[in-house]
């Protein structure tokens, strides 16, 4: 097992940032810690790194109890959101820094640096300074520097948070390919649901210092364990079980709070025995997808997402009368509002 967190808690004054967390991360996996601000994800990452010490519990890295080890003793690579590169050093010198501190032989340092420059697709830029690089390139240098010392665990704290959307998306795909090459046990913190789902092997959803659910992206999305997970992972309509849209459906609704994904709202132009009447109140064109805001006859607002092809079939317009039904939905006894 790469990382084991056993009943770990951490408190700052009266605020309990991490509350009795238990977590196992297999060696070689790429795992996302996902949650809103204040959920404890960054504190948990710092506890694994040794930058914070737990009040209770143990941290086990590659089979050894690391709870009382220093950061240096843990053999961890750490990448922050804002790069933390040395401005007065070239790209090559930044990558070599950790190896030189450890007094590695010069020929080994040179070979490792060139290998990493190629790995992070920065060959030819080794003599540039950080100020001469784009944000995406600087983050690649930070990752190369973290990998230079061949860490047993790589920790990334919102590594793409300071970048614009296009660069962030490109780097996500690149990080996934990089991980598939190096196979280092990697944990990264993010509040971006799409980022977590796209990049990771497993997602750890956190809320108020606790782990709500651990699973693959598909498991987290398709089988959420709690109303919080359902609400936090992707868009959702939250409706009472008494809503008109469920009255004629064949779905089994067990609890009073029903969660309906926009893509699971079926829109028809004519009524049948399982549909409810609704009015189109707003259309939002995103190019690849159309968002449709609907108002049911009972006043409930429901959002639907349509593919471009389905939208072209329906030819919807504002104020148009349509008929809707749920394709799938989940209900929970309690509703946690984010």
UniProtKB/Swiss-Prot annotation:
Keyword Membrane: yes
Localization of this protein: Cell inner membrane
Record-listed ATP binding positions: 35-42
GO molecular function annotation: ABC-type sulfate transporter activity; ABC-type thiosulfate transporter activity; ATP binding; ATP hydrolysis activity
Main location per the UniProt record: membrane
EC code(s) of this entry: 7.3.2.3
All copies of domain ABC transporter, residue ranges: 3-233
Catalysis: reaction(s): sulfate(out) + ATP + H2O = sulfate(in) + ADP + phosphate + H(+); thiosulfate(out) + ATP + H2O = thiosulfate(in) + ADP + phosphate + H(+)
Pfam families registered for this protein in UniProt: ABC_tran, TOBE
Principal EC category: translocase
Membrane topology of the entry: Peripheral membrane protein
InterPro entries: AAA+_ATPase, ABC_SmlMolc_Importer, ABC_transporter-like_ATP-bd, ABC_transporter-like_CS, Mo/tungstate-bd_C_term_dom, P-loop_NTPase, Sulph_transpt1, Transp-assoc_OB_typ1
Alphabetical keyword list: ATP-binding, Cell inner membrane, Cell membrane, Membrane, Nucleotide-binding, Sulfate transport, Translocase, Transport
Entry's Gene Ontology cellular component terms: ATP-binding cassette (ABC) transporter complex
Subunit structure: The complex is composed of two ATP-binding proteins (CysA), two transmembrane proteins (CysT and CysW) and a solute-binding protein (CysP).
PANTHER family, alphabetized: SPERMIDINE/PUTRESCINE IMPORT ATP-BINDING PROTEIN POTA, SPERMIDINE_PUTRESCINE IMPORT ATP-BINDING PROTEIN POTA
Record's function text: Part of the ABC transporter complex CysAWTP involved in sulfate/thiosulfate import. Responsible for energy coupling to the transport system.
Family membership noted in the UniProt record: Belongs to the ABC transporter superfamily. Sulfate/tungstate importer (TC 3.A.1.6) family.
Protein name stated in the entry: Sulfate/thiosulfate import ATP-binding protein CysA
Name of the gene: cysA
């Amino acid at each position: 097992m790469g990382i084991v967190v056993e009943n770990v808690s951490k408190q700052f004054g009266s605020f309990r940032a991490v509350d009795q967390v238990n977590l196992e991360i297999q060696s070689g996996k790429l795992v996302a810690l996902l949650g809103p601000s204040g959920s404890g994800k960054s504190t948990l990452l710092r506890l694994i790194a040794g930058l914070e010490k737990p009040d209770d519990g143990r941290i086990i890295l590659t089979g050894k109890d690391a709870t009382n080890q220093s950061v240096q003793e843990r053999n961890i690579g750490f990448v922050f959101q804002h790069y933390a590169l040395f401005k007065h050093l070239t790209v090559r010198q930044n990558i070599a820094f950790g190896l030189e501190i450890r007094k590695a032989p010069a020929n080994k340092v040179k070979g490792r640096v060139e290998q990493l420059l190629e790995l992070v697709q920065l060959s030819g830029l080794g003599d540039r300074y950080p100020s001469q690089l784009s944000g995406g390139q600087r983050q690649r240098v930070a990752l190369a520097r973290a990998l230079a010392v061949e860490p047993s665990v790589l920790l990334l704290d919102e590594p793409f948070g300071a970048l614009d959307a296009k660069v962030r998306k490109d780097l996500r795909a690149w990080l996934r390919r990089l991980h598939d090459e190096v196979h280092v046990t990697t944990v990264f913190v993010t509040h971006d649901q799409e980022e977590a789902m796209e990049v990771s092997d497993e997602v750890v959803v956190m809320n108020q210092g606790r782990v709500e659910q651990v699973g693959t992206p598909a498991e987290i999305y398709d089988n959420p364990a709690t109303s919080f997970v359902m609400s936090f992972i992707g868009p959702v309509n939250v409706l009472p079980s008494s809503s008109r849209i469920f009255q004629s459906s064949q779905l089994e609704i067990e609890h009073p709070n029903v969660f309906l994904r926009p893509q699971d709202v079926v829109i028809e132009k004519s009524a049948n025995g399982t549909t409810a009447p609704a009015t189109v109140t707003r259309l939002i064109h995103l190019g690849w997808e159309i968002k449709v805001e609907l108002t049911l006859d009972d006043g409930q607002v429901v959002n639907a997402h349509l593919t471009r092809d389905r939208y072209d079939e329906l030819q919807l317009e504002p104020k148009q009368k349509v008929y809707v039904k749920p394709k799938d939905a989940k209900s929970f006894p309690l509703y946690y509002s984010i």
